[in-house]
Swiss-Prot record:
Domain of life: Bacteria
Protein name as annotated: Succinyl-diaminopimelate desuccinylase
Catalytic residues as annotated in Swiss-Prot or TrEMBL: D75, E141 (proton acceptor)
One GO process term, biological-process aspect: L-arginine biosynthetic process
EC number: 3.5.1.18
Organism for this UniProt entry: Pseudomonas putida (strain ATCC 47054 / DSM 6125 / CFBP 8728 / NCIMB 11950 / KT2440)
Length: 383
């Protein structure tokens, strides 16, 4: 293990944050450590505790000019079986292969450390920079996400705060640092479908209506439906059934009801209303007795090539020598809430190969490179 004195400022802070067991929605004083450092270099700090969630908003600079915000989360997912880890999950150990090991190393305490150190350096090097550097940090990203970034964004909108550009520190890289950045995400629309039949005895099917039999053709049609073609930035919209439940557990009883959980990951070529209408039409066509409860997790968003994406790509190229690939693949992130402010949003962070897994880890040296990428992006946009 590398001795603490040998660690860079970024790695020292990353290890400090990882050693705090901030399983969602607990923050475990991670934000206090970040705010202490940001406050020491002149950031204006605004803690926002909403229900059981810790958040903070911090800014440095004048009211005039563009705003570049770093966004992220201090909460992590549970470790899973601790005995399956090679090292203690919250030990923040750098192993013989130079890997920083621990829950949150990739998702996303490493990025948080890089953001803070890059911003410290930038405001000291450019104390009179144009516009503002901002931070929007939450402890409610891995959980329900009701009282975190979403709620903070609503407060910022209510007082007419402006965010021009936002870098979310989600682990976007796939094989090498900076090989992929996320310049958008698909929308996520979930539903619980209930199809009602009539319970009865399996020996007397004429006296019952089997909801499994009734639902099967409709579900098959939904699964086979071609929802859209996608576009240059998004793949076609996908429909997936994740759960089917029916039956009493007895082998001689026709069930009276079936429930199905399904999810759309949808592109900008489809709308919530359009998808809902098409589902309703298919269910009605099969003459089912049905009801559905919809849950929208987030709308699709896209940051097209422009100032932010260009600056990030140039910084990655300058630091690593590699060309980045913009992508909209993967799940949702808090970027979906920030994008509703009309903000250009890009996700850039470490390699995501072990996120949410036992033995989460990243190459420790990547964090110093990530700090430099964030710093160079600040220089390009606000110096």
């Amino acid at each position: 293990m590398t001795a603490p004195a040998e660690l860079s400022p970024t790695l020292q802070l990353a290890c400090d944050l990882i050693r705090r067991p901030s399983v969602t929605p607990v923050d475990a004083d991670c934000q206090a450590q970040m705010m202490n450092r940001l406050g020491a270099v002149g950031f204006q700090l605004e803690p926002m505790r909403i229900e059981d969630v810790d958040n903070f908003w911090a800014t440095h600079g004048s009211q005039d000019g563009p705003v570049l915000c770093f966004a992220g989360h201090t909460d992590v997912v549970p470790t899973g079986p601790v005995q399956q880890w090679q090292h203690e999950p919250f030990e923040a150990l750098i192993d013989a292969d130079g890997m920083l090991c621990g829950r949150g190393a990739a998702d996303m305490k490493g990025s948080l450390a890089s953001m803070v150190i890059a911003s410290e350096r930038f405001v000291q090097d450019y104390p009179n920079h144009r516009g503002k550097v901002a931070f929007l940090i939450t402890s409610d990203e891995e959980g329900p996400a009701h009282h975190g970034t979403k709620a903070v964004v609503e407060r910022l909108k209510a007082r007419n705060e402006r965010l021009d550009w936002c870098i979310v520190g989600e682990p976007s890289s796939t094989t090498l640092l900076g090989d992929v950045v996320k310049n958008g995400r698909r929308g996520s629309l979930g539903a619980k479908l209930t199809i009602r039949g009539k319970q009865g005895h399996v020996a007397y099917p004429h006296l019952a209506r089997n909801p499994i039999h009734l639902a099967a053709p409709a579900l098959a049609e939904l699964a086979a439906e071609h929802w859209d073609e996608g576009n240059a930035f998004f793949p076609p919209t996908s429909f997936q059934i994740s759960n089917l439940n029916s039956g009493t557990g007895a082998t001689n009883v026709v069930p009276g009801e079936l429930t199905a959980l399904f999810n759309f990951r949808f592109s900008t070529e489809s709308t919530v209303e359009g998808l809902q209408a098409r589902v309703s039409a298919i269910l009605d066509k099969h003459e089912l007795d049905w009801s559905v409860d919809w849950a929208l997790s987030g709308l699709p968003f896209l940051t097209e090539p422009g100032e932010l994406l260009d600056a990030v790509a140039a910084s990655i190229k300058g630091v690593t020598g590699r060309d980045t690939q913009p992508s909209t693949s993967g799940g949702t992130s808090d970027g979906r809430f920030i994008a509703t402010m009309g903000t250009q949003v890009v996700e850039l962070g470490p390699v995501n190969a072990t996120i949410h897994q036992v033995d989460e880890r990243i190459l420790a040296s990547d964090l110093d490179l990530l700090t430099e990428i964030y710093y160079q992006t600040l220089v390009r946009l606000l110096a």
